[in-house]
């Protein structure tokens, strides 16, 4: 039955042809997307569905709070470590543990490293092939490609011979008939706008980034012992410091610290001379995408803030990445966010496969309930083989978080807009420079293209903070301050019988919060609201759509059976994609299989 209604400035209408994209994998599992298109192939309805139940919040009940970080870290293997960071913050907040300055600095180094790594991997490996036509690169003139690259930056790997070699490697790959990960791309799609030379340059940098990302993450192995899933500890960091070779064997020494500095220098070089110029090149060829995929970004955005410069201080004066919330498009009024305020953050489940005592009411995470209740309702197909979801009923394993009743967008774009409108000088300078180079207004950031540009902006910001915190660490070490952990309250006997705490930070993909309640030295309630929960949110009792759903509204598809436009916008949020996708017609028959990168 068709349904039409108004919400958040959009007319949602599920009449017309239905396309199903399933699965699209993301951080916590797999994601499904369904859209309706009208006679002009314009999306009039979008449905975002999380198709995998997580359950870690249930697993944590009754466990030792000091172990929580090791469990929740496994929520995601891509933005690895960030859930552990939020977890140790939450447990320390509950118990009342103060960490040493070095522990705070090293945690910020770990987070800044993750931002640099994740933004590079997203830009090239996950979203890049939505903009770079690999096969078109075979038509490029390597000499012209070299001239283009050298006009953009002083990156040394830009000679005609270098691009000739890359093109030759690609040609052999294609001629062999084994395209591998590039096999199911929509090469030649009319939305690919880069010149052959820009495509060859982008493909070459794709290969370089694939190799270089392995180097960046070595910083995690220095301070966390391994990657993915580095080690953390409630009360600080588990790495001892031994700069004069007199301490513990295996501790962080000057050789490893020099390695960290070398990686930071090379990371800054790659971001400034490869990633940022590539992002601007994509922008130059794709300016219409500065008006596509706006979604909630011009209405409601949210950031918790991150990178406390002062140990144990999460106030606005300490956070180098500002936090705040904007609703109803009023960017002149960036409101403070309090994660303990039960009227601010609430999660709804009336369109999710969970159950509350009253499904029409939202619940603050401290009062959160994770009770799965799979009840797809009246769908096309069967409960185990759904051909088409019914968004008027329950349709996702993702709850619907709301801030003061509003659906919000989180992530790099949200953070950038909030920092910009709070007057952060570095953000204003960077954003204005980018938009001036592209001859686009600031509103052009509120788009699919804008999310891509914000990744480049944030990568530059993060690597500058990586150097900043490393310099702070080295100053402390030179002054004889080697402490990395506070174990005064390690033993449960020193804890209150009942306590609760909140840990928050900004994952590369957006606002991340953990809420922990402890009773009798064991976890009583543990709730996570992750970035994808916000962005991939289903509808709520008011019919408000989530950020993914809103961003797809109004998008015109050139070739519905080749939904590059859908993938571009979804990838701009970075739901951590890796699997093959199937596009289904409204009768349930498969139209085409695509590789989602």
Swiss-Prot record:
Task: Tell me if Metal-binding is a UniProt keyword of this record.
Answer: yes
User: Do you know which Pfam families this protein is assigned to?
Assistant: NiFeSe_Hases (PF00374)
Which Gene3D superfamilies does this one have? Answer: Cytochrome-c3 Hydrogenase, chain B (1.10.645.10)
According to its UniProt record, the EC number is 1.12.99.6
Q: What cofactor(s) does the depicted protein rely on? A: Ni(2+)
Q: Which GO terms describe its cellular component?
A: plasma membrane
- Family indicated by similarity: Belongs to the [NiFe]/[NiFeSe] hydrogenase large subunit family.
Instruction: Describe its partners and assembly state.
Output: Heterodimer of a large and a small subunit.
What is the protein name for this chain?
Answer: Hydrogenase-1 large chain
